[in-house]
Amino acid sequence: MRLRIGLDIDDTVCDFINPYLKRFGTPHKDSEITRNVNRILIKDREFWLNLPVINRPNFMPALYCTKRVHSKAWSKKFLELNDLPVAPIYQIYCQISSKAPRIKGRVDVFIDDSISNFIDLNLHGVPCLLMDAKHNRKWGPVGRIFSLREEEIEDCYNLFLDTLYPNFKDLVYDKFG
């Protein structure tokens, strides 16, 4: 049985952070990124359509789920322009909202670069693997993937389910608690 795999877009499929930093410089707080996205980038179609692809899936994702605030049509156009698999896009407009209610039952596993999304999804019953990125390396190696190769995802998913996932809540509360 093939896994139903869901994907985040920014910093999982495409590079968001480097084009952002090139344009705005290093933020002093994460809230600066949110403010610049909500006030400036929300209107900049070319920025979103021209983000470079950093990880290309070798499978058809079940869905994409993103916290992008612009028109969903721009995300679809980005996928088409970059010859990426087109799948349903679930968009969460609030950065602090959980992706879990939108995707639970629709995927077997979700791939995200955000530690907060990774923790939230796993705590809410959606197995999530962490796409390796410079900004998330404080999380350990278990549950981390380095490509969007289906075989790597399946291997990591099976290991994750057999080891960390059953005790995820206890481990997270011990670490961040």
Predicted feature descriptions by range:
Residues 1-45:
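Active-site neighborhood of HAD-like aspartate-dependent phosphohydrolases
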Residues 54-82, 92-93:
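Substrate-recognition element of Asp-dependent hydrolases with the DxDx(T/V) motif
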Residues 89-95, 143-159:
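Short acidic-hydrophobic, aromatic-tinged amphipathic segments that line or gate anion-handling sites
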Residues 109-149:
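Acidic, Mg2+-coordinating phosphoryl-transfer loop and its flanking beta/alpha structural elements
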Residues 14-16, 22, 71-75, 99-101, ...:
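Short catalytic/ligand-binding loop motif for oxyanion handling, primarily in non-cytosolic enzymes
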Residues 8, 63-67, 111, 131:
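Short hydrophobic segments within beta-strands
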Residues 1-7, 170-177:
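Non-catalytic pre-domain segments flanking phosphatase-related domains
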